[in-house]
A protein has these predicted regions:
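Positively charged n-region of N-terminal signal peptides that target proteins for export
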Residues: 1-5
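Glycine-rich, small/hydroxylated-residue low-complexity segments
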Residues: 8-9, 16-488
Length: 488
C-alpha cells in the first residue's frame, strides 16, 4: 500500500510539475510571438519590398498544455483586397518542456514547443483546396528549442487535376528545414518525385526526381554563404515541333569568405541532352572565383536593389549611375587581386570531347595618389594575366555538325556528307584570323595576355596590334614565333 501511495504521489508531483512547466512555456511562447511576427515583417520588407504583404496574429487561445493561434498574411495593396481575400494558417502549439506531440513519437528531448500548422480554406485558397478535396495542401510540423532554434518538416500534398485540355500531375514534396534562432544558419532539404504539366495542344513539361539541398551561414555583411546543390534526374519538354530531354542536370556551389574577401566554386553538369531522340552528348562547367572584395560587392548590390524600380523607369540615368558606381568601387574590388577560372567547360559526344579552359587574374590599378584613368583604360590595366585554351577533336566537331543538320531536316546521309565541309569551312574562316590551329585531327587555340603583350597560337604582338587586326579585318599577326636555328 505504501509503495502504491508513493508511486501515485510521484506521478502527481510529476504531473503538477509538467503542468506548471507547460503553462510557463506557454506564457513564454505568447511573449515571444509578437517579436517573431515583428521580425518576420521586417524580413518581408527587407527581402520583398515590393510584395506589400504583412503577417499578423489573430485568435490566440492559450491553454495549459496546448495553445491555438491563427496567422494571417495580408496584402497591403487596397486594389488586391477583394472580398477580404487572405492567406491564413491554423497552428496548434504543444507546450514544452515535453510537448505532447513529441512524447507520442517517443522524442523525449526537452523543447519549448512543438507546432502543427495547416492552411485555412479561405477564399484566396478555395481553388487549391478543391484540388486536394478539402485537405490542407501544405502542412508543417515544427520543433522549437528553448534557445529559439527551429526544425521543421513541410509536406506538400500530391495533386492530380484534369480540366478540358489541361492536366496537372504532382507527386507531392517534402521540405525539411533547420534554422538557428538568429536566422543566420539555415539548412534546407527539398525533394519531389514528379511534376507534369500538359496541354493537349501545346505539349507538356515533365520533371522527375528533383533534389535541392542548401546549408548556408549569414556573414556580417549579410551574404548567405555555404554549400548548395540541385539535381534534376530528368527534364522533358515536348511540343508540336520539339522533344527535348535533359538527363542528370546538376548544379552545385560552395562559397565562403576569408578576411572580407569572397570565394566561390560553381559546378554545372548534364549527363545527356537528347533532342528528338538524338543523343547530343553530355557536358560540364566548373567555375571558380576568388579574392573578391565583399564590401565592394555589397555596395553594388545595395545600390542595384535600391534603384531596381528606377532602372525600369529611368534606364539611361540609372545605367550612368551604375557605371559611376563600378568605376568608384573598382580600386577596392581589385585590391585583393581577384581571380576567375573556368576549368573546364566541356562537351562530349560519341566521337570525343571538346574542352575549353580560361584563367583571368586581376590586379590593383594604380598606386594611391595617382590620377585615375578613364574606365576603359582601367579595365585594361586591371588585367594581370588572361589565358584561354581550346581543344576540339575534328571527329567530335563533325559528329555535332551532322546531328545539328539532322535536327534542321537533313537526312542521315545528307548530314554526314555536309558535316565535314561545314567544319572545315568554319576552321578556314577562323584560321584567316589565326584564331585556331589544326593539327593531327585536333582543332586548337591558345591565347595568352600579360604586360600589354598578346600571344595567340604562337604569334606574339602588342594588345593594340591584336585589337587592330580585328578592327581592320586583317589577319592577327605581328611577329612569328622564333624558329630554332638550323644546322647545315
Amino acid at each position: 500500500m505504501k509503495k502504491s501511495l508513493v508511486a501515485v504521489s510521484i506521478i502527481a508531483v510529476l504531473g503538477t510539475a509538467w503542468s506548471g512547466a507547460s503553462w510557463y512555456t506557454g506564457k513564454l511562447i505568447e511573449q515571444r510571438m509578437e517579436t517573431l511576427v515583428a521580425n518576420t515583417n521586417q524580413q518581408l520588407k527587407e527581402y520583398l519590398p515590393d510584395a506589400g504583404v504583412r503577417l499578423s496574429v489573430e485568435n490566440y487561445r492559450r491553454g495549459i498544455f496546448t495553445s491555438q493561434v491563427r496567422y494571417v498574411l495580408h496584402n497591403e495593396d487596397p486594389s488586391m483586397q477583394i472580398n477580404g481575400d487572405k492567406v491564413a494558417s491554423l497552428v496548434k502549439i504543444d507546450h514544452g518542456p515535453l510537448p505532447l506531440s513529441q512524447v507520442t513519437r517517443l522524442n523525449l528531448l526537452p523543447a519549448m514547443a512543438s507546432l502543427h500548422a495547416e492552411l485555412e480554406n479561405t477564399a484566396a485558397l478555395k481553388t487549391l483546396f478543391d484540388l486536394t478535396k478539402g485537405k490542407s495542401p501544405i502542412t508543417s510540423d515544427t520543433r522549437i528549442t528553448f534557445n529559439g532554434d527551429i526544425s521543421s518538416v513541410v509536406d506538400v500534398l500530391p495533386l492530380n487535376h484534369e480540366q478540358s485540355e489541361y492536366r496537372l500531375t504532382f507527386s507531392g514534396a517534402k521540405l525539411t528545414a533547420d534554422i538557428s534562432h538568429d536566422l543566420k544558419n539555415v539548412r534546407l532539404d527539398f525533394n519531389t518525385d514528379n511534376l507534369e504539366i500538359a496541354d493537349k495542344h501545346q505539349g507538356k513539361i515533365v520533371l522527375h526526381r528533383v533534389t535541392c539541398q542548401s546549408d548556408t551561414k549569414k556573414t556580417p555583411l549579410n551574404f548567405n554563404l555555404g554549400t548548395q546543390f540541385l539535381r534534376v534526374k530528368q527534364l522533358q519538354v515536348v511540343g508540336d515541333a520539339q522533344d527535348v530531354l535533359v538527363e542528370g542536370f546538376t548544379m552545385a556551389s560552395q562559397t565562403d569568405d576569408k578576411d572580407d574577401y569572397l570565394n566561390g566554386q560553381f559546378d554545372y553538369g548534364v549527363s545527356a541532352l537528347k533532342i528528338h531522340g538524338n543523343d547530343l552528348g553530355s557536358g560540364q562547367l566548373k567555375l571558380k572565383v576568388n579574392n573578391v572584395d565583399a564590401k565592394a560587392v555589397k555596395a553594388f548590390i545595395d545600390f542595384y536593389n535600391q534603384q531596381s524600380l528606377n532602372l525600369l523607369q529611368q534606364y539611361e540615368a540609372t545605367q550612368q549611375q551604375l557605371a559611376k558606381l563600378v568605376e568608384h568601387n573598382m580600386p577596392r574590388l581589385l585590391k585583393g587581386y581577384p581571380t576567375l577560372s573556368i576549368s573546364p567547360m566541356s562537351w562530349k559526344n560519341s566521337q570525343g570531347e571538346a574542352t575549353f579552359t580560361f584563367n583571368l587574374d586581376l590586379q590593383e590599378l594604380l598606386p594611391p595618389g595617382t590620377v585615375a584613368a578613364p574606365l576603359d583604360q582601367q579595365l585594361t590595366q586591371a588585367i594581370k594575366r588572361l589565358e584561354g585554351h581550346l581543344t576540339i577533336p575534328e571527329s567530335m566537331a563533325t559528329e555535332s555538325a551532322a546531328q545539328l543538320a539532322q535536327l534542321q531536316g537533313a537526312s542521315t546521309q545528307q548530314a554526314q556528307a555536309m558535316a565535314p565541309q561545314q567544319v572545315q569551312g568554319l576552321v578556314a574562316m577562323a584560321q584567316k584570323f589565326n584564331l585556331v590551329t589544326q593539327q593531327d585531327g585536333v582543332i586548337g587555340g591558345n591565347f595568352h595576355y600579360a604586360d600589354n603583350q598578346v600571344e595567340l597560337n604562337g604569334n606574339k604582338m602588342s594588345l593594340q596590334a591584336f585589337i587592330g587586326g580585328f578592327a581592320g579585318d586583317a589577319p592577327v599577326t605581328e611577329a612569328a614565333p622564333e624558329q630554332p636555328a638550323q644546322c647545315h
